[in-house]
């Protein structure tokens, strides 16, 4: 019987699919900003959401590095404009390469307040404060109708604001009228 390697186990176990995923060109102050936008739509609280979004984002960054590594290997076989050093070749990432930022939004379609963790640190077991500077954290970007005010609903340039407001007051018949 042949043993599975760690990479085969990992690739099998972390195959995940986002609800919605788009490449976005955002313009601010006349400058273009490119990013990857993931959307997780929840109607119930997912109590491990910080881990889930961190995993999705990390998988996208790893995918970008992997695509870059293929380009580096291909350029090594062809005439490259700049020689790649051994560290760049091994990592699959040149010193001046850059990743496209990934943002994951969690859209909670429920009138109740999200009572789950909002960051990885909210999920940690108790630990000594002396190690806190060494522990990484990861927060979720949550849109929860119950936590939005009237002025927040107005910020949406589509009917999504109206839908979220409807969700917020769906349990309150008096405010629905």
Tell me the role of every PLM-derived stretch.
Residues 1-177:
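Elongated, amphipathic alpha-helical interaction scaffolds
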């Amino acid at each position: 019987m042949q043993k599975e390697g760690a990479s085969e186990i990992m690739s099998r176990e972390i195959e995940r699919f986002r609800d919605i995923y788009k490449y976005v060109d955002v313009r601010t102050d006349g400058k273009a900003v490119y990013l990857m936008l993931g959307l997780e739509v929840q109607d119930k609280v997912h109590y491990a959401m910080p881990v889930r979004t961190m995993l999705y984002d990390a998988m996208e960054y790893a995918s970008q590095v992997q695509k870059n590594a293929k380009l580096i290997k291909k350029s090594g076989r062809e005439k490259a404009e700049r020689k790649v050093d051994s560290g760049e070749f091994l990592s699959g990432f040149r010193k001046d390469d850059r990743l496209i930022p990934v943002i994951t939004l969690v859209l909670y379609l429920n009138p109740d307040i999200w009572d789950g963790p909002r960051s990885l640190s909210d999920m940690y077991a108790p630990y000594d404060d002396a190690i806190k500077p060494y522990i990484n954290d990861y927060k979720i970007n949550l849109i929860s109708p119950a936590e939005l005010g009237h002025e927040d609903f107005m910020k949406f340039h589509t009917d999504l604001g109206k839908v979220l407001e409807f969700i917020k007051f769906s349990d309150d018949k008096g405010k629905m009228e």
